[in-house]
Amino acid sequence: MPPADAALPGAAAADALAAEAIRQAALRYCRGVDRLDAGLMLSAYHDGATDDHGVFTGSAADLCARVVRSHRRYEATMHCVLNHAIEITDDSHATGEVYNVTYLLRAADGGRQLDTWWGRYLDRYECRDERWAIVHRVCVHEWTRSEPLGAAMPIEAQLFRQGREDRGGSGYDGK
């Protein structure tokens, strides 16, 4: 393995930087959903981007607002990015397939229910003004599961910093 500071040949270096910028966009989207931060979610998209999320097809801006509203019913959510295949097609265009798993915790029938979503995002990206972002996303459903939660893990969870679904949650600002 070459040293971390070894220079890659021109095009390979540009592709590696582009792929990392695209991955960061995917992470901003997920973090924004989990923190109910539409602005952070929207930063993953370019102006005028579109999104087909099955239950909603339209502008990315409208999707982000809708997601924040709809996710308020959950006690907590966690959107996880898994495999992220990216193909850089030229200096300003790329496509990607992002595997994702989402955990959604909600109150149900006097207890708590964990809903789990497995899916993929099929993305088209563009680089505009030296910024890579999504211009079109299709959300593909693979499968889902819903199950009642039993007792919590036998750990002293109250001793940990507790997460929240907003900008005030521990770790949001690095503190």
Question: What residue ranges belong to the model's regions?
Answer:
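Short beta-strand edge/turn micro-motifs at domain boundaries
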Residues: P2, T95, W118-A152
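Extracellular/periplasmic carbohydrate-active domains that bind, remodel
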Residues: P9, Y99-D109, W118, R145-E147, ...
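Short, low-complexity N-terminal intrinsically disordered segments enriched in polar/charged residues
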Residues: M1-R31, R35, G39-S43, D47
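A solvent-exposed, acidic/Ser-Thr-rich amphipathic alpha-helical stretch
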Residues: A38-L104
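Hydrophobic/basic alpha-helical segments enriched in Actinobacteria
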Residues: A21-I22, G39-L40, S59, E87, ...
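Short beta-strand segments enriched in hydrophobic/aromatic residues
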Residues: V33, Y45, N100-T102, V138-H141
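Acidic/histidine-enriched, glycine/proline-rich intrinsically disordered or flexible terminal extensions
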Residues: R145-K175
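Outer-membrane beta-barrel transmembrane domain signature
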Residues: L114-T116
